[in-house]
C-alpha cells in the first residue's frame, strides 16, 4: 500500500533503507517506516547484505552515542580558550621580539603590518600544528580533552585547517558558551571530547 513516503523511500539507497528500518527506526513516523519496510521487501535485499549493513549501522550508532556522551561543557571549553590565548600571545610576543631584534624596523606602517602578520600567523600555526599533530592544543592537554570528527575518528588535516580558519569568524570564540559545540566545530564537523575515549 502506497503512502506519501513511498516515492521518498524508493529513492533511498539500500544502506539508507536498512538504517531506517533498524537503528534509526525511532526517528521516523510510522507511515515512513511502513514505506521503508515495503521498499526493503520490494528490493529483495540479500539477507547477508542486510545483516552486514545493520551491524555496521549499530556499531556507528554506538560510537556516536559514546562520543556524544563525552562532549565537554562550556566551562572546560572556556578554560581551553584562556590557556590557548595565553600560549598564543606568549608565542607572538617572543616571535615579535626576535623579529624586532633582527630587522629593527623604523616605519610605523611596517611595524604594524609585521605585528598583524605575527599575531595571525602565530594563531593559525599554533592551532593547526598542535591539532594536526596531537589532536589538541596546550589548553586541551591541560584539560585532558581532544578534537575528534563527529563519529569519534581522528580529524583529517583538512578538518583541522577548516576548524582553525573558522575560529577567525567574529563571535566564534564565545559561541561555545551558548551551544555545546562552537561555530568552528559545527563548520568543520568536529567535536571536543574527554580524552578517555577513542
For each of these PLM feature ranges, what is it?
Residues 2-198:
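Membrane-interfacial and juxtamembrane segments of integral membrane proteins
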